C-alpha cells in the first residue's frame, strides 16, 4: 500500500488534515473551558433572571405556560418543586443528573452555575453537553410555592439550520480537499514518475530519449541534471563501444598476422625463411604484450581511487633516468638529446609519472629525423612546474593536434604504435593536477608542454 509515493503523500496529507482537525477541536475545547464558559454561564443566568423578572412584572400567574413559552424560544427548562417533582419544558435533556442536594440549595435561594463549573471533558465541548447539570438555576416563587428553575440554551434548535449548513460545508470542504490533495499529489509525483521511467530506460541502455524540463522548481533542476547525466552516460557508452571496437581491432589485426605467419612457417622450406617468420611472430607478440600492458595501465588510471600520490619525487632525476635509458635508441638515429633541468621535487606517483614522461621522450626520439635533436627542459615559478619536450621531426597537422590525445588515435595507418601512449600520458598528468598541450607545425617539429600546479605539501 505504501510502496507508491503517490499513495504515501496522499495518505500522509489526509492524515495531517485529520490530525489538524482533532488538534483544533481539542484546542477550541480548552479555550471554551478556560475563557468562554464563564461568560456563557453569566449570559444565560442573566437571561433567566430577566425572564423571571419579566414574568413577575407582567403579573403572569400561571408558571407552566410561561416555562413552556421559554421552551418554544429554544431553551431547555427544568423545574423542581419543594416536594422534588421535576417538570421539563422544551427539548428533552439527554440526561438528568442534577443532584437532590443541588436542587435543595437552589430552593433555599442559592444561584446554581452549572455551566461555569462543568468539569473539563476533552471529548465533548461543554457548550454541547445536553444534561441538566450543564445549566444555570435560580429559585422561583409562584402562588406561595418555591421552585428551583434550571435552564440552558437548546443548541439543537438554535443551530438546527446552521448545523445543516455546517455539515454541508465540512463535507464539501473534506471532499474538495481530498480531490485537490490527490490532484496536487499527482502533479508533484508526475515528474518523479517521468524520472523513474527515464532511469529504467537508462538501465536498459537507451540514452537517446531526451528528459524534458517541465518545471522551474527543484523538480525542474532535477530533470535538468538527469538529462545532463543521460548525456554523460551516452558519451561514456559511446566511448566504451568505440574503445571495445578499437581494442578488438588492435588485437584482431596482429592475431590475424600471427595466424598468417604460422601458416607460412608451416610450409617454409628453408631455415632462413623459418627464422624470418619466427622473428616476425616475435615482433607481433611483443606488440600484443605492449598493448596488454597499456590497457592494464589505462584500467588502473581510470579506477584511480586506490592509487597513492605521496611519493616524494625528484622530477629532474626521474627525467635524467629516462634519458639515459633511451640513449641507445637516440644513438641508433644519431640524435642529440639536450636537457636543461632545474632541481625540482613534487609529490605524486613516481611509477606513473615515469611512464608518462617515458612515453613522451620515446615518441620524440621515434619521430625525430636522423641526426636531429631532442630538447628537454624543466623549470618552475612560484605557482607552477613546467616541462617541455621538443623534437625536430616532421610535425603534425591541426587536425592531428586536435585528436592526438584520443585513445587509439593514429595519425597514419602505417604507424605501428597502439595509439595509447599520449592518452595514457595525458591521463597521468591530469591525476597529478597537471595539463599537457601540443604545439606543432608541418616540417617544423613538435613541442609538448606539461604544466603542474604546485600543491602545498601536507604535514602528517
Curated annotation (Swiss-Prot):
Compartment annotation: Cell membrane
- Where is each HAMP domain found? 186-238
| Keyword set includes Membrane | yes
The membrane topology term of the UniProt record is: Multi-pass membrane protein
SUPFAM superfamilies per record: ATPase domain of HSP90 chaperone/DNA topoisomerase II/histidine kinase, HAMP domain-like, Homodimeric domain of signal transducing histidine kinase
The EC category is transferase
Q: Which residues cross the membrane?
A: 11-31, 164-184
Q: Name one GO molecular function term.
A: phosphorelay sensor kinase activity
* Name this protein carries in UniProt: Heme sensor protein HssS
Amino acid at each position: 500500500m505504501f510502496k507508491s509515493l503517490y499513495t504515501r503523500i496522499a495518505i500522509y496529507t489526509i492524515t495531517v488534515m485529520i490530525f489538524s482537525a482533532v488538534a483544533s477541536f481539542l484546542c477550541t475545547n480548552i479555550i471554551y473551558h478556560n475563557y468562554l464558559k464563564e461568560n456563557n454561564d453569566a449570559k444565560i443566568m442573566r437571561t433567566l433572571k430577566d425572564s423571571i423578572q419579566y414574568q413577575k412584572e407582567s403579573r403572569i400567574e400561571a408558571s407552566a405556560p410561561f416555562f413552556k413559552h421559554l421552551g418554544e424560544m429554544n431553551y431547555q427548562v427544568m423545574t423542581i418543586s419543594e416536594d422534588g417533582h421535576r417538570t421539563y419544558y422544551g427539548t428533552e435533556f439527554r440526561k438528568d443528573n442534577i443532584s437532590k442536594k443541588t436542587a435543595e440549595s437552589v430552593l433555599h435561594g442559592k444561584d446554581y452555575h452549572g455551566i461555569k463549573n462543568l468539569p473539563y471533558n476533552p471529548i465533548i465541548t461543554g457548550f454541547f453537553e445536553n444534561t441538566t447539570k450543564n445549566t444555570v438555576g435560580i429559585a422561583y416563587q409562584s402562588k406561595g410555592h418555591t421552585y428551583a428553575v434550571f435552564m440552558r440554551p437548546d443548541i439543537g434548535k438554535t443551530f438546527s439550520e446552521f448545523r445543516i449548513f455546517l455539515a454541508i460545508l465540512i463535507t464539501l470542504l473534506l471532499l474538495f480537499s481530498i480531490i485537490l490533495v490527490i490532484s496536487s499529489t499527482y502533479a508533484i509525483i508526475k515528474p518523479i514518475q517521468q524520472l523513474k521511467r527515464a532511469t529504467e530506460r537508462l538501465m536498459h541502455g537507451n540514452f537517446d530519449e531526451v528528459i524534458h524540463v517541465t518545471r522551474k522548481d527543484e523538480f525542474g533542476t532535477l530533470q535538468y541534471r538527469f538529462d545532463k547525466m543521460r548525456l554523460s552516460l551516452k558519451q561514456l557508452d559511446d566511448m566504451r563501444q568505440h574503445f571495445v571496437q578499437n581494442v578488438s581491432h588492435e588485437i584482431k589485426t596482429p592475431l590475424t598476422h600471427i595466424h598468417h605467419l604460422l601458416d607460412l612457417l608451416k610450409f617454409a622450406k628453408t631455415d632462413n625463411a623459418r627464422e624470418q617468420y619466427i622473428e616476425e611472430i616475435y615482433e607481433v607478440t611483443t606488440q600484443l604484450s605492449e598493448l596488454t600492458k597499456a590497457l592494464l595501465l589505462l584500467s588502473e588510471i581510470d579506477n584511480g581511487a586506490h592509487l597513492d600520490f605521496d611519493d616524494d619525487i625528484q622530477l629532474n632525476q626521474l627525467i635524467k633516468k629516462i634519458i639515459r635509458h633511451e640513449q641507445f635508441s637516440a644513438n641508433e638515429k644519431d640524435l642529440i638529446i639536450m636537457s636543461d633541468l632545474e632541481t625540482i621535487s613534487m609529490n605524486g606517483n613516481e611509477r606513473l609519472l615515469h611512464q608518462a614522461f617515458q612515453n613522451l621522450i620515446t615518441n620524440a626520439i621515434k619521430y625525430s629525423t636522423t641526426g636531429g635533436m631532442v630538447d628537454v627542459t624543466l623549470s618552475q615559478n612560484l605557482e607552477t612546474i613546467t616541462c617541455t619536450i621538443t623534437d625536430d621531426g616532421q610535425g603534425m597537422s591541426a587536425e592531428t593536434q586536435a585528436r592526438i590525445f584520443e585513445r587509439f588515435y593514429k595519425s597514419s595507418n602505417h604507424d605501428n604504435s597502439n595509439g595509447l601512449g599520449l592518452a595514457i600520458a595525458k591521463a597521468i598528468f591530469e591525476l597529478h593536477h597537471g595539463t599537457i598541450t601540443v604545439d606543432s607545425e608541418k616540417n617544423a617539429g613538435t613541442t609538448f608542454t606539461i604544466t603542474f600546479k604546485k600543491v602545498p605539501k601536507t604535514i602528517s
